[in-house]
Each structure stands twice: as C-alpha cells, then as structure tokens.
Swiss-Prot record:
Keyword Flavoprotein in record: no
Protein's name according to its UniProt entry: Large ribosomal subunit protein uL5
InterPro entries: Ribosomal_uL5 (IPR002132), Ribosomal_uL5_C (IPR031309), Ribosomal_uL5_CS (IPR020929), Ribosomal_uL5_dom_sf (IPR022803), Ribosomal_uL5_N (IPR031310)
Broad class of the protein's primary localization: nucleus
Entry similarity comment: Belongs to the universal ribosomal protein uL5 family.
Gene from which this protein is expressed: RPL11
Amino acid sequence: MASEKKLSNPMREIKVQKLVLNISVGESGDRLTRAAKVLEQLSGQTPVFSKARYTVRSFGIRRNEKIACYVTVRGDKAMQLLESGLKVKEYELLRRNFSDTGCFGFGIQEHIDLGIKYDPSTGIYGMDFFVVLERPGYRVGRRRRCKARVGIQHRVTKDDAMKWFQVKYEGVILNKSQAIV
C-alpha cells in the first residue's frame, strides 16, 4: 500500500499554465486575417490582434497598426498542441530557449507540419510557441483578494523547467554550438 503512494510532494509538481501561439506577419490586411484563420483552425479559439507600439518607416509599419495575432490555450488542448509542436522540433530545444522564470519558447517554420492540410489560398505561416510553467499555489500571486508573493523556493527556475522538459517529453537540450540549422 505504501509503495503505491507517490513519494514526491504534489505541490512541487510542475504543470503547464498556458500555451501562447503567435504569428507575427508585420503588416495588416489580408495576410494577417489569413494568419488569424490558421490560428483559429489550429486552436478552435478566436485570436487576438497585436498592434505596433511605434512607427518603423524602414519596415513600413505605422503606430497602432495591427501586425500580429496570437491565441492563448490552456488545459488539455494546450498539451496536445505543445506535443505536436515539439514533435516538429524533434523534441530538441536550445538551452537559451528557456527563461530564468521557468518559461520556454520555440518557433516552427511551417504550420502545415502540425497536421493542418495545406490550402493554397491561405499559404504557409510560421509561428512561435510560448509555454508558461507553474506549480500549484501560484494563484496567490494572481488573485484579487489577499494577494501575496510566491516564495523563492516555490518558483519555477530555468533548471527546473529544463529538467521537466527532459523528463516529461524525453527531450534533448542542446547548447548553441551543438545546434545544427
């Protein structure tokens, strides 16, 4: 009976809080709406548009112009999309893909690698995956009433995130010199 119980503390287990899929087109108009359609097809949710913060004349971008779209996915759908995204990357990430706060991100070149059928009218879009990891109890930092800080011992660190990735997905973490592009 005792051997069946987990010896690890359930409050220390790391889980995916959310997955953010981002497609940055760099211009508003038809290409951006087609990119939004790709995200909606992939996630089943309506994407949100991001605006440019300031004007960049060399790129032809004006301030407050819609230039990108993103969607935030949580729960089982997030795990499913993350699995398919990591499969495209062959479960290999660089060490620099992980942040100090325990989050990680990566990009893919073509959205059709995720299993969406190619549509000539839509085209092919690359996208970024951003994964936010947390432990149970992180709500104390987000709640409205009696807000508190998450303790240093309880926060997810870069090493924790890399270890979680290696154990959960049997992933490989490469240094910059090992990466073959």
